[in-house]
């Protein structure tokens, strides 16, 4: 039984009902419908912290999905899971791949910046200020891109950019 039919969360149930209605109304191929079902089940598993199950669903959705825009969100969610698991290199790879397909994903730029900032803090703890500055500079570039896409969001990042004199 698909995960979306067994989930007890009200929001997930509502999303599933609306998604099922849309899938019936909007003309889509059976492959697109199946890809969306895997994507939806991946979201459900991810929201419950079942990352292995979510990844299986996302990989299957990627195999079936042909639309680059839709694939970008699948890739983004795979990146989120790798971020949550502390697999930052893999996460960055998936965020990059998502942005290749959809350059309007400010949340991907933000997450990439957070990872770079974290690596900068790690470098400081290890006593390597030169490497830390390089990571912080990279974080700044990603945050600038996120802010450019959605002005008014990422206020903490905006403040950090001003405080560290990285905002142009």
From Swiss-Prot:
GO biological process terms, semicolon-separated: photosynthesis
UniProt TPR repeat ranges: 35-68, 72-105, 120-153
Disulfide bond annotation, renumbered to this chain: none
Annotated membrane topology: Peripheral membrane protein
Primary subcellular site in the record, as a coarse category: plastid
Pfam families linked: TPR_1
Signal peptide: none
Gene Ontology cellular component annotations, sorted alphabetically: chloroplast thylakoid membrane
Family stated for the protein in its record: Belongs to the Ycf3 family.
Role played: Essential for the assembly of the photosystem I (PSI) complex. May act as a chaperone-like factor to guide the assembly of the PSI subunits.
Protein name: Photosystem I assembly protein Ycf3
């Amino acid at each position: 039984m698909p995960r979306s039919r067994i989930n007890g969360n009200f929001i997930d149930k509502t999303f599933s009902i609306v998604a099922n209605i849309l899938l019936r109304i909007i003309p889509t191929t059976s492959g697109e419908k199946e890809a969306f079902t895997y994507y939806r089940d991946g979201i459900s598993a991810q929201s419950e912290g079942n990352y292995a199950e979510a990844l299986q669903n996302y990989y299957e959705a990627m195999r079936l999905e042909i639309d680059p825009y839709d694939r970008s969100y699948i890739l983004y969610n795979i990146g989120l899971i790798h971020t949550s698991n502390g697999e930052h290199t893999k996460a960055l790879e998936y965020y990059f791949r998502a942005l290749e397909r959809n350059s309007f994903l400010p949340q991907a730029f933000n997450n990439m910046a957070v990872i770079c900032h974290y690596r900068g803090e790690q470098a400081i703890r290890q006593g390597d200020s030169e490497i830390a500055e390089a990571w912080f500079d990279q974080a700044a570039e990603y945050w600038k891109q996120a802010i450019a896409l959605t002005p008014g969001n990422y206020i903490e990042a905006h403040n950090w950019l001003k405080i560290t004199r990285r905002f142009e």
